Amino acid sequence: MGQRVIAPELQALYDKGAQVYSYSKLGTIHDCPYNAYLTYIEKREQCANVYSSLGTVVHDTLEGIIEGKNTEADIGPAIENGLDELDMLGIDFPKTRDGGNGIRDKWISNMRCMARDWVSPKGEYEVEKLLILKLRDDRYLQGYADLIRVLPDGRLQVLDIKTSSQFKDEDLLHYGRQLVAYTLALEQAGFKTAVPCWIMVKYCKITYETGFGKRAKPSEKVLDRCKVGYTLRSIVRSKMKAAGYDSEQIEIVT
């Protein structure tokens, strides 16, 4: 993403002397004051890392599909080009405890599966929308929502594209505040809203039945994309065994 031009709405607030807080800046100050000092006081140039660099590549390509600038066929080449650039710069993924490349291999496997199978969300969207939440007459919070989905009933839903790992339950409140703040900004502007969501591109949800006959009931699992095939195979093999198929038949089918 390039440097953003100051939006007229923000300039109007600056001109009247209002204090405008950036959500991302506040997050940096809260999470690591030393990082905030180096970034905003010392103005140090930040070092690139694999997650921010590749996350931006995926993020921009998926948004480009929604805007009509890209297609699903562009995802794979964009990821491969991003990996090649990092290799040339000598920037690598963290190593596992034994010094291996398991973290890199898993991330790449998930992203390649995503690139192969991705179906872009359909409907009406706004991309990288500036949202401003009024805290009081002289204080405001501003940020940019990845996507705002316009639902058929007219409500707006804030969506955030994530290439990171799933959040732990105890971290949901911390990371969810940003989406809540953006949703409040929409409501403050007079819009009706729906519950905000993350789009976690490394994962997908599969639905399947467990049990047989009257005992059958739907079950759901959220899995790494690269594990879906193995998981479904395991489920099918288990159900075939329970249904009386012998091991040779199961092996042939699965």
Descriptions of predicted regions:
Residues 125-254:
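Mg2+/Mn2+-dependent nuclease catalytic core
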Residues 57, 61-130, 134-135:
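A non-catalytic, helix-rich entry segment at domain boundaries
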Residues 50, 54, 103, 107, ...:
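Hydrophobic (often cysteine-bearing) scaffold residues that line and stabilize catalytic clefts
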Residues 17-31, 139-151:
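An acidic intrinsically disordered interaction segment
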Residues 39-40, 60, 64, 113, ...:
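Residue-level signal for well-ordered alpha-helical scaffold segments within enzymatic catalytic domains
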Residues 27-37, 70-91, 154, 247-253:
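Short, compositionally biased low-complexity segments
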Residues 23-70, 128:
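Nuclease catalytic cores
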Residues 4-18:
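Charged, compositionally biased N-terminal leader segments and the immediate start
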